Structures are given as structure tokens and as C-alpha cells.
């Protein structure tokens, strides 16, 4: 996996995100459950396109889910105040209403396949599903405000994003980080970040690289923060 893998994946997924907006527009006068059902169908095709472009590497599976819902929310709100982050995130919650229960209520050790399903069974961690269903509070109240604050204080886009990413990591339970290590390591990492953030928003990246830690879930939330920031800036 390298930068070109991600570029190939992003290029393959661009039409999917356009489709998500169209689905939102087409179902804006229908129950949000209809929007979600159509999204899931489109998402399965997008996953296949991603794996085809990356030769089987998962680069954007989380983004297909979370940003797909975000794009459909924009479509549903396109006739109204659709560039206000709080309204968009509220619509995401409407689209995902009941998602955790519908996806996890019948899980067993035998039918749990994904890491998210297994972590829910073991620790009752709802992951990105819980975040989306709650209206992405980690984005609205943690990541996005820190991103805006950093930019307002003169940080460049990268450094403000780094500060936002670390804030997101301590504001959520990153299932990708747990899957790449274990829950004890995740908890210790969060505690380390909290201690470092008191001194500086830029910890040594070797803390993560040396242990092969990947906060992919928090990275997806950061992408949403950037998305909403640029969208609001254009309004």
C-alpha cells in the first residue's frame, strides 16, 4: 500500500460519491430508510470497485460508508440550508436511525465476520455506526472545532488537521486502532495522546509507526471534518 494505491482508489470511488448525492436528492421526499437502503446497494458496488482498483487492498472502506451517508445527507438537504455542518450531521443521524440495532442485534460468535462486528460482541463498541447514528458528535464537538481553531490561529491545513486527528482519537474508540493491536494498546495510546496534548499538538510519529498503529477510524472522521470545513467555507 502506498500513495498511488490511495490515488487509484480515490479515482475509482469518485463516481460513487456523486451517486450518493443523487440518491439523497431522489429520495429527499421519502423516508430516510429508503435512502439508506439504496446507499447500501451502491456501497457494495463501490467496495468492489475499490478492491478492483487496489488489487484487493482496503483503502477506503470506512469512507465508503461514512462519507457516502454524508453525501446522501447533502442530497436530501439540497433544497434547504444544506451547508451548515450541524444540520448536515443531524440528517446523517436521521438516515442512520436504528442502524446499530439492525446491524448488531442478531450477532453471534458464529456469524460475526468483520472486526467491527467482533469488537461489538466482545466490548459493545459501536464504532462508526454508533457515531453516525448519534450525528457524529466527535466531528461536531471535537474534530471540527479544533480544525477551525488551528486554522484561525495561523496553523496550516496539515498541522491543524494533525491536531484535529489527535483530538478525534481521544474522543472516540477507534476500532481500526484496536483491530491493528488490542483494546489495552488503544487505551494506553489514548492516554499517551492526552498527556502529550497538554504540552504540544504534535507528538513524535514514531509512537505510532513503531507499533504499527493505524487510527483509520479517526482518519475517516478527519476527512469528514475537512469536508464540512470546505463546504461551509464556500457557503
Q: Locations of the language-model features?
A:
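C-terminal appended segment following the main domain
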Residues: 198-235
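Generic detector of intrinsically disordered, low-complexity, polar/charged segments
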Residues: 40, 53, 59, 65, ...
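Short, hydrophobic/aliphatic alpha-helical segments
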Residues: 39-55, 201-211, 229
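Phosphate-rich cofactor/ligand-interacting catalytic cores and adjacent structured alpha/beta frameworks
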Residues: 1-32, 36, 40, 74-206, ...
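Short, surface-exposed loop/turn segments at secondary-structure junctions
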Residues: 29, 33, 53-58
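Generic hydrophobic, aliphatic-rich segments that mediate packing or membrane embedding
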Residues: 9, 35, 39-42, 46, ...
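Conserved phosphate/anionic-ligand binding catalytic regions in large, soluble enzymes, centered on
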Residues: 54-71, 212-227
Amino acid at each position: 500500500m502506498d500513495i498511488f494505491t490511495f490515488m487509484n482508489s480515490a479515482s475509482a470511488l469518485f463516481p460513487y460519491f456523486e451517486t450518493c448525492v443523487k440518491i439523497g436528492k431522489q429520495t429527499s421526499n421519502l423516508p430516510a430508510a429508503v435512502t439508506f437502503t439504496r446507499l447500501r446497494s451502491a456501497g457494495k458496488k463501490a467496495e468492489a470497485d475499490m478492491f478492483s482498483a487496489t488489487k484487493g487492498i482496503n483503502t477506503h472502506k470506512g469512507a465508503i460508508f461514512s462519507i457516502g451517508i454524508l453525501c446522501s445527507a447533502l442530497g436530501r438537504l439540497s433544497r434547504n440550508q444544506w451547508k451548515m455542518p450541524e444540520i448536515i450531521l443531524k440528517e446523517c443521524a436521521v438516515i442512520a436511525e436504528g442502524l446499530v440495532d439492525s446491524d448488531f442485534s442478531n450477532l453471534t460468535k458464529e456469524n460475526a465476520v468483520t472486526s467491527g462486528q467482533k469488537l461489538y460482541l466482545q466490548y459493545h463498541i459501536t464504532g462508526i455506526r454508533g457515531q453516525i447514528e448519534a450525528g457524529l458528535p466527535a466531528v461536531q464537538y471535537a474534530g471540527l472545532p479544533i480544525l477551525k481553531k488551528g486554522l484561525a490561529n495561523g496553523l496550516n491545513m496539515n498541522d491543524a488537521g494533525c491536531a484535529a486527528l489527535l483530538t478525534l482519537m481521544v474522543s472516540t474508540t477507534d476500532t481500526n486502532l484496536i483491530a491493528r493491536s488490542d483494546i489495552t494498546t488503544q487505551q494506553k495510546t489514548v492516554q499517551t495522546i492526552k498527556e502529550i496534548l497538554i504540552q504540544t499538538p504534535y507528538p513524535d510519529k514514531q509512537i505510532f509507526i513503531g507499533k504499527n498503529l493505524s487510527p483509520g477510524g479517526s482518519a475517516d472522521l478527519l476527512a469528514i471534518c475537512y469536508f464540512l470545513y470546505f463546504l461551509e467555507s464556500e457557503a
